Amino acid sequence: MTELVSGRDVLRQARELYAHYRPAVQPTGMKVAVIRFTPAATDPPDWRVRLEASRISAEQKIKSFEHLGFRADHVVLPPGVGRGEFREVLEGYNADPATRAIIVQFPPPRDLAPVVDGMDPAKDIDALLKGRSPYPACATAEGIYRVAEPFATDRPSIAVVGSKGFVGQGVVTMLRADGHDPMTLDHGDRLERVRDADIVISVTGSPGILTPDHIQPHHRVVIDSGFVPQADGSVRGDVRAEAYGIPQNLTPVPGGIGPVEMATLMERVVRQEVDPDVVSWKVTPGPYLERARFTTDRTAAATAVTTAAVPSIAAAARLRGAAGPAAGAPPTSAQPTPAPRGPAHQTGPRPQLPPQGGGGPSH
């Protein structure tokens, strides 16, 4: 059976790890600004859906930063906002010394995108400024990379679907920096090629683009970063629900990469403003079989029975239970570990840190 890689467990761990910074942060008045856009009633439905996802994400960011003791400004710009008004808001936060980080929720309206380039690079905590940000990729991309990393210690084949998008580019950048050579796929490519990968990462935002025809039992982990709100209040990811029982491990939607993004932003702002040696959250992989052993063991199991075939999902489940993981660890859990540091952005003395323990309120 498929093991779910819980992003909510990662976020819970991050909140516990970083709660003890709150008493040091809160008196400083340090602030994070989150700016988002509102659709007009006449906008196309797909645009309204994207901005609804942006709203949900912005609200979760506000909660995460406030949990750490930062003040959080949630700036909601009205439909049809002009470049001048948007630029004025952005420049105000650039000039405000109390504002330590700025996030502009993506996507901005096309005619406003150039204004984002005016953000102070030192406050670009989500890597919106290509080539000028202190970070190599956005928090979502880093979170995806860190979820995939413990499944990829032996340099397996990794497919990234949606590799040309904002998040996808970041994922590919981080994988290549770590020595991987990912298979990059986008709309119009032959998506069935993902069958040949050991790890599948999908960041298209196209509901159900990956079906049971694409997802395979030998896939160590399928990481689904899609998040598309539906009219009935549900949320759909890139992977169809019918494929959820096929891979060995999977990040669910909702409750997968979204919370991981929040944990990454919390870690970044603490490292940037409070403690450069902050302990990092970590994902420990669920059990999985390497493809060579998976194939060999499945063939042996099929030979041992007299019926025509052993169903693939049931066979994979029995094999994992009987043989145990050839790589990986017990089911998903979160353990602290050091991670690459972000920038040392600090214009004044760091707040004095209390002994670790305790924490702020839970949102």
Question: What residue spans do the PLM features occupy?
Answer:
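Short beta-strand elements in bilobed, periplasmic/extracellular small-molecule ligand-binding domains
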Residues: 62-79, 181-185
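Rossmann-like adenosine-cofactor binding region
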Residues: 187-275, 281
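Positively charged, low-complexity intrinsically disordered leader regions
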Residues: 1-30
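Anion-binding alpha/beta catalytic cores of soluble intermediary-metabolism enzymes, centered on
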Residues: 4-7, 101-155, 190
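Glycine-rich phosphate/diphosphate-binding loop of Rossmann-like nucleotide-binding domains
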Residues: 42, 46-60, 135-225, 247
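Non-Sec secretion/translocation targeting segments of pathogen effectors
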Residues: 308, 315-363
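Short, well-structured alpha-helical segments in soluble
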Residues: 85-97
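C-terminal helix-to-coil terminal segments
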Residues: 2-5, 9, 260-307, 313-314
